[in-house]
Curated annotation (Swiss-Prot):
GO cellular component: cytosol; extracellular region
The keyword Isomerase belongs to this UniProt entry's keyword annotation: no
Gene3D superfamilies in UniProt: 3.60.21.10, 5'-Nucleotidase, C-terminal domain
Keyword Cytoplasm: no
Location (main, coarse): secreted
Native organism: Arthroderma benhamiae (strain ATCC MYA-4681 / CBS 112371) (Trichophyton mentagrophytes)
Name of the protein: Secreted protein ARB_01864
C-alpha cells in the first residue's frame, strides 16, 4: 500500500517537471515511446563467471554506493540486473548457505541516491527508491554522506528508512536532531550485537567518514572521538562472547590519513580485544578493493552504481557456539591467509595471532547481471531463478519509472561521448560536449550580448552519454546536481583569461567531502571503452565496464570484453568475470566555454564570468584574487537558474531533435 501511494504522489510531483513539447514550447511533450527498459528486456551479459565461489564458515554479500541504480544499467550488458533480480539471487544464496550449513550476511555501506532518475525524481530524493531498496533483507546497513546533504533527505532516512531495518541500521557516529525533543539522537542503532544462524557471536559498528558537508540538523562524530566514548569502549569490552568484530560503513576500505576511520576503529578494538578477528567493509570511493590490514583483519570495497556485488568468505573463526560447517563440502573453500600478495595457498611461515586461530579468506567481485546471478545461484536457469518477490520488485520498478516519466525521450544523442576513454581534447570526450552546451544554453538573457566565460567543475559530470535516446533518466545520470549558475559582471579579461589555468593548478574540487568524481563508462563501435576519471587517485585499481551497443552480430564467447580489471592486496584474480583493460585519459579539474566574443577576432576588455554555484565562493573568488582581483562572495550575482530543468535538457530540446521519434541506439 505504501509503495503505490508513494508512486502516486511522486508521479503528481513529476508531472510538474515534465519537459515542454519539442515542437511546441510550453506544451507538455507526449512521447509515447519508452527506450529499452530494464527487467526482462535488459541486455544480456556476454561472458559468464570464471568459476564457482568459495564458501567458508561465514560469507558476505556486500553492496555500497548504489546511488539509486535499482533498475540496473539499461544500456550496459555487464550490469543488466535490477533489484528484483538481486532479490531473487539473495534468496537462492541464503538457501544454499542453509544447505551448506554456513552463515551468509548481507551488508550495505550507504549512499542510496543522487545519480539516477528513479531515486532523484521525487521530493525528497529516495522516497520511491528507498522503499524498493528496503525489500531486500539486509543484516547490516550504514549511512552515507548523500543521506545527509539535504535536511529533508536526512529526516526521510531517519523517520522511514532506518525504521524498516531497526537495529540493523547502524550509525555509530551519526546523529540527528529529533524534531519533537530538539535533542540529538542516533539515526540508527549505535552498534549491533547478534548471533548468526549457526552460532557465531558478532559485534558490529557502522560508521561514516569524518564528513563535514551535512546540513545543520545532523552531526557526524569523528572516528578519533568515537573510539573514546564510554559506550563504544563498553561495547567492545562486553562480557558477552565476541567471535568476530565487523566494522563497516561509508568510508574507503583502504585507509590513509585522509580517510582513517576504519583504521582508527580497528586499532582501538585490537587494543581492547586483542586476537579477535575483525572484518571491515567500506565504500564511498567507488572502487573494487580488498585490503589486508594484518593476519586477523581485512577489508572489502565493492564498487558502485549496482555494477559490483562483493563476495567475501572466511573460515577459521574460533567459537564455542558455532554449530555449522567450517569447510562446507561440495564447494571450493577459502585457502588464503591474510598476507599481501597471497595469490595462492600460503606455504610461508605463519605466526598465529591467537592459539588455534588460522583464518582463511576468499574474495570475489561479481558483475551485476542475471547471467552472473543465475550461475552462482546453483546455476539456475531463468525460469528457476526468478522468485515471486523478485518479479514483484521488477514490476514495481518498471511501474515507478513509467509513473515518474524517467523514460520520457527528450532528444536523440547523435554520437557517444565518454569521460576519459579518449583524450580530453577529442571530439567524443564528454567535456567537449559540455563546453558546447555551456556556450549555447547558459546565458542571462538581458546580458546575452556581453562576452562571457563559463566555468564548470568536471566532478559534477558523473556518467558517459551513449548515442541514442536521451531521457529524463539520462539527465539525472550524467549530471545529478542542481543547475544554478552565478556570475561576476564586467571582470577584466586580463584577469579572467588566467582563471581556468589557476583553477586547474589549484585544489581538487570535491563536492563537499566527495572522494573523487566517478562515472561508469560507455562505448560504441566508434569510441573506445573508458574507465571513470579519478583525478586524485591516479594509481587506478580498476577500470569500469563500458556499454556495448545493441547490435545483431555473432558473439565470440572466447573474447574478453572490456570491463573491470582489479588489482588488490590478494592480486589480480578477484574479478568474477574476466575482462580486458580499458584505456584511461586524465581530465582537468575545471572546463571553460566562451560566448559572444567579438566576431572580428579581437579580445574583449571585460567579460561576464559565469560559473556553477558550487565552485563560486569557495574556489573562483580566491583564485581571482590571487590573480590580482579584489572580489568577495558578496559580489556574486545570480546568472541563470535552470530550476527543475538542466542545461542538458535545454540543449537536448534545442539541438537533439533530429531523429525523433524513432531514435535508435547505434
Amino acid at each position: 500500500m505504501r509503495f503505490s501511494t508513494l508512486v502516486s504522489l511522486a508521479a503528481w510531483a513529476a508531472a510538474a517537471l515534465a519537459c515542454d513539447s519539442c515542437s511546441e514550447p510550453g506544451k507538455p511533450a507526449e512521447h509515447k515511446r519508452l527506450v529499452r527498459r530494464m527487467q526482462p528486456e535488459a541486455l544480456g551479459a556476454l561472458t559468464k563467471p570464471k568459476g564457482p565461489l568459495e564458501w567458508g564458515q561465514i560469507n558476505f554479500l556486500h553492496t555500497t554506493d548504489t546511488h539509486g541504480w535499482l533498475e540496473g544499467h539499461l544500456k550496459e550488458q555487464n550490469y543488466g540486473a535490477d533489484w528484483g533480480d538481486y532479490s531473487s539471487f539473495v534468496k537462492h544464496m541464503r538457501q544454499k548457505a542453509d544447505r551448506l550449513r554456513v552463515d551468509l550476511l548481507l551488508i550495505d555501506c550507504g549512499d542510496l541516491h543522487d545519480g539516477n532518475g528513479l531515486s532523484d525524481s521525487t521530493s525528497p530524493n529516495g522516497v520511491i527508491s528507498n522503499e524498493i531498496f528496503s525489500r531486500v533483507d539486509y543484516d547490516l546497513l550504514s549511512i552515507g554522506n548523500h543521506e545527509l546533504y539535504v535536511t529533508d533527505v536526512a529526516y526521510e532516512t531517519f523517520a522511514n528508512f532506518s525504521k524498516v531495518y531497526g537495529e540493523r541500521y547502524v550509525t555509530s557516529n551519526v546523529q540527528i536532531i529529533n524534531k519533537e525533543t530538539g535533542e540529538y539522537e542516533y539515526i540508527g542503532s549505535k552498534y549491533r550485537y547478534f548471533t548468526t544462524k549457526h552460532g557465531l557471536k558478532v559485534m558490529a559498528f557502522g560508521v561514516l567518514f569524518d564528513f563535514t558537508g551535512n546540513s545543520n540538523v545532523s552531526k557526524v562524530i569523528k572516528a578519533a572521538d568515537l573510539v573514546q566514548e564510554s559506550w563504544f569502549i563498553d561495547a567492545v569490552k562486553t562480557p558477552k562472547p565476541v567471535d568476530l568484530f565487523i566494522i563497516f560503513g561509508h568510508t574507503p576500505a583502504r585507509t590513509d590519513d585522509k580517510f582513517p576511520t576504519l583504521r582508527t576503529l580497528r586499532q582501538k578494538i585490537q587494543e581492547l580485544r586483542p586476537g579477535v578477528p575483525i572484518q571491515a567493509f567500506g565504500g564511498h570511493n567507488h572502487v573494487r578493493d580488498f585490503v589486508v590490514y594484518d593476519e586477523t583483519s581485512t577489508a572489502l570495497g565493492s564498487g558502485r552504481y549496482c555494477e559490483t556485488l562483493g563476495w567475501l568468505s572466511m573460515t577459521g573463526i574460533n567459537s564455542r557456539t558455532f554449530r555449522g560447517s567450517m569447510k562446507p563440502r561440495g564447494v571450493p573453500n577459502p585457502t588464503r591467509r591474510a598476507i599481501k600478495g597471497n595469490a595462492t595457498t600460503s606455504t610461508q611461515p605463519y605466526q598465529h595471532p591467537r592459539k588455534g586461530l588460522d583464518l582463511r579468506y576468499a574474495r570475489r567481485y561479481l558483475d551485476w547481471n542475471r547471467l552472473t546471478f543465475a550461475y552462482h545461484a546453483s546455476k539456475s536457469q531463468d525460469r528457476q531463478f526468478d522468485t515471486q518477490k523478485g518479479l514483484k520488485i521488477t514490476h514495481d520498478i518498471t511501474d515507478a519509472r513509467k509513473q515518474l516519466n524517467t523514460s520520457t525521450v527528450l532528444g536523440c544523442v547523435p554520437e557517444t561521448y565518454c569521460m576519459s576513454c579518449v583524450p580530453f581534447e577529442a571530439k567524443n570526450n564528454i567535456y567537449q560536449l559540455v563546453i558546447d552546451m555551456l556556450a549555447k544554453v547558459v546565458v542571462k538573457e538581458d546580458r546575452a550580448d556581453k562576452p562571457r566565460l563559463l566555468l564548470l567543475n568536471t566532478g559534477g559530470v558523473r556518467f558517459d552519454l551513449v548515442k541514442g535516446p536521451f531521457t529524463k533518466d539520462d539527465e539525472y545520470i550524467v549530471y545529478p546536481f542542481k543547475n544554478q549558475f552565478q556570475y561576476l559582471p564586467d571582470v577584466p579579461y586580463s584577469i579572467a583569461k588566467e582563471l581556468l589555468d589557476a583553477l586547474n593548478k589549484g585544489p581538487y574540487q570535491r563536492r563537499s567531502e566527495e572522494y573523487s568524481p566517478m562515472a561508469p563508462q560507455l562505448s560504441t563501435n566508434e569510441v573506445c571503452a573508458n574507465p571513470s576519471p579519478e583525478f586524485v587517485q591516479l594509481k587506478r585499481r580498476e577500470a569500469p565496464q563500458p556499454y556495448r551497443p545493441i547490435t545483431r552480430r555473432t558473439i565470440d564467447s572466447s573474447m574478453l570484453y572490456p570491463g573491470y580489471v582489479t588489482s588488490d592486496d590478494f592480486g589480480l584474480d578477484g574479478d568474477d568475470t574476466p575482462h580486458s583493460k580499458i584505456p584511461y585519459f586524465k581530465v582537468p579539474i575545471d572546463i571553460q566555454a566562451n560566448a559572444s566574443f567579438p566576431t572580428n577576432g579581437s579580445m574583449p576588455t571585460v567579460v561576464d564570468l559565469a560559473f556553477v554555484d558550487y565552485i563560486g565562493a569557495k574556489y573562483v573568488i580566491p583564485a581571482l584574487n590571487k590573480l590580482g582581483g579584489k572580489y568577495s562572495a558578496s559580489d556574486i550575482q545570480s546568472y541563470k537558474d535552470f530550476g527543475s530543468s538542466s542545461f542538458l535538457r535545454e540543449y537536448a530540446l534545442e539541438f537533439w531533435q533530429e531523429g525523433l521519434p524513432n531514435c535508435t541506439t547505434n
